[in-house]
């Protein structure tokens, strides 16, 4: 199908034409992603084994829950990439990026598999972690949230109606703002809490690179939303705004339940109330990025997660010379303020 027949990004079809390029920003994002290639073999987890032995029972419980979530979270993301996003975002430039993103999600899954093998030497513990969606209520609730908001578009073959396109937008926004942009941001906060105390350096190093990748994925998805808003502004009505706001509120509550599971009665420097404020701050940032008003007005309580309004992590990685890139050795040091 030629470009002249396809007027909008979500028009059904399979656009193949890269010249003239209709969406050069998506292509540039693909090229930027290539520069940030990393491999699991670059992550040294040896020192983490000794650190694990130093943790309190409460901290060990937190780590166990984190690796259980990591074991399943990126698989949900990868499935949605293949079954929904690649299918309906009709741009060869965007599909180049999505192909690259799928590779990155596979690297993340490999990293978490290596993490599980290192952190959980008992085969039964590993099996339980991979079955977390079935046997850990707080993780099951997060998975159910994802399926509730994302599955409605799965059986749609073509986005031919406004209602179908709004359902797709809800899927994309859930994927970007809630899973990549809230659930993973919450999980990474626990990792950096350990890192701020000089613990689990290997986990923190791998998380630096995963965090950067996830932020780039989120920003790409938001750019897709921006493009659809320009091409079809009528899709962004009051009802969609309310649905997105409700979605973010539900995501905060689901992630907060996970936080209660991880934190219990609280740990020094990490407790449920602080996590609530952090998640609300992140949710407000996501709503504002989508062009909707914030609802919480909370501030980030974690000095170790001072992200200048949460949304500027990508800029941080771009300006740090130690960020890993192809043919460049080094790690990201989060000890410095940013």
Predicted region positions:
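Non-heme di-metal
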Residues: 1-338
């Amino acid at each position: 199908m030629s470009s002249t027949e396809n007027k909008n990004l979500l028009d059904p079809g399979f656009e193949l034409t890269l010249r003239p390029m209709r969406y050069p920003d998506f292509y540039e994002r693909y090229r930027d992603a290539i520069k940030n290639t990393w491999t699991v073999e670059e992550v040294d987890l040896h020192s983490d084994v000794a650190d694990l032995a130093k943790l309190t029972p409460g901290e060990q419980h937190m780590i166990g829950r984190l690796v259980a979530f990591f074991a399943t979270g990126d698989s949900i993301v990868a499935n949605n990439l293949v079954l929904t996003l690649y299918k309906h975002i009709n741009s060869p430039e965007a599909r180049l990026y999505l192909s690259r993103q799928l590779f990155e999600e596979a690297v993340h899954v490999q990293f978490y598999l290596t993490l599980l093998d290192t952190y959980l030497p008992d085969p039964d513990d590993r099996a339980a972690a991979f079955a977390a969606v079935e046997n850990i209520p707080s993780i099951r609730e997060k998975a159910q949230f994802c399926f509730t908001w994302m599955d409605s578009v799965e059986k749609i073959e073509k986005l031919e109606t406004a209602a179908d396109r709004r359902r797709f937008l809800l899927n994309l926004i859930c994927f970007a703002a809630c899973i990549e942009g809230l659930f993973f941001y919450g999980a990474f906060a626990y990792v950096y809490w350990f890192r701020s105390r000089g613990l689990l350096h290997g986990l923190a190093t791998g998380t630096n690179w995963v965090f950067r990748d996830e932020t780039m994925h989120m920003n790409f998805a938001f750019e897709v939303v921006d493009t659809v808003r320009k091409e079809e502004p009528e899709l962004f009505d009051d009802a969609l705004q309310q649905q997105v706001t409700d979605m973010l509120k539900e995501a905060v509550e689901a992630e907060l339940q996970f936080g209660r599971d991880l934190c219990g009665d609280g740990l020094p420097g990490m407790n449920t109330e602080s996590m609530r404020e952090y998640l609300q701050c992140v949710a407000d940032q996501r709503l504002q990025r989508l062009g909707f008003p914030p609802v919480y007005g909370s501030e980030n309580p974690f000095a170790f997660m001072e992200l200048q309004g949460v949304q500027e992590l990508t800029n941080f990685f771009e300006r740090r010379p130690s960020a890993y890139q192809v043919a460049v050795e080094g790690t990201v040091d989060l000890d410095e303020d940013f």
